[in-house]
Swiss-Prot record:
Gene3D superfamilies: Transcriptional regulator MraZ domain. It comes from Bifidobacterium longum (strain NCC 2705). This is Transcriptional regulator MraZ. It holds the Pfam family MraZ. It is found in: Cytoplasm, Nucleoid. The lineage of its organism: Bacteria, Bacillati, Actinomycetota, Actinomycetes, Bifidobacteriales.
Length: 150
């Protein structure tokens, strides 16, 4: 896998402080520490994307958006809520109020690694989501990953 960036993996529980700042998990700083884009994610989470991954996704959506109304609408919502961030010397980023409202983020949050991106979740929402999805985990794998051998 030479040339590929390390995957973002794991589950972390940082806090969002009174100023809206959150410390990036130390293991994510090599991929996100030079800058990242925060954007509205699916299921009311916030995506934390390395710049290159954000550009790749936005470019793919833009290629289909001109003639596809749903793609245009998705692109508008996705890009209008996207914010580029530079972590400070302590590895903290400001989570904008708009995104905190979107994902119902208070001080207790969860950051999960999802391969090429991280996701920022309300702690209670994540725990409920995970509990619900873990029940059908094996069934989902059969449908989504039919060619992957474990």
């Amino acid at each position: 896998m030479a040339g590929l960036p390390p995957l973002l993996l794991g589950t972390y529980t940082p806090k969002i402080d009174a100023k809206g700042r959150m410390a990036l998990p130390a293991k994510f700083r090599s991929q996100l520490g030079q800058g990242l884009v925060m954007a509205r994610g699916q299921e009311r989470c916030v995506y934390l994307l390395p710049f290159d991954e954000f550009r790749r996704i936005a470019s793919q959506i833009q290629r289909v958006s001109v003639g596809n109304k749903a793609a245009r609408e998705y692109l508008r919502v996705f890009l209008s809520g996207a914010v580029d961030q530079q972590p400070d010397k302590q590895g903290r980023v400001l989570v904008p109020q708009m995104l905190r409202d979107y994902a119902n983020l208070g001080s207790d949050v969860v950051v999960i690694g999802v391969g090429t991106r991280a996701e920022l979740w309300n702690k209670d929402t994540w725990e409920s989501y995970l509990a619900e999805k873990e029940e059908g985990y094996s069934d989902i794998a059969d449908d989504v990953l039919p060619e992957v051998e474990f």
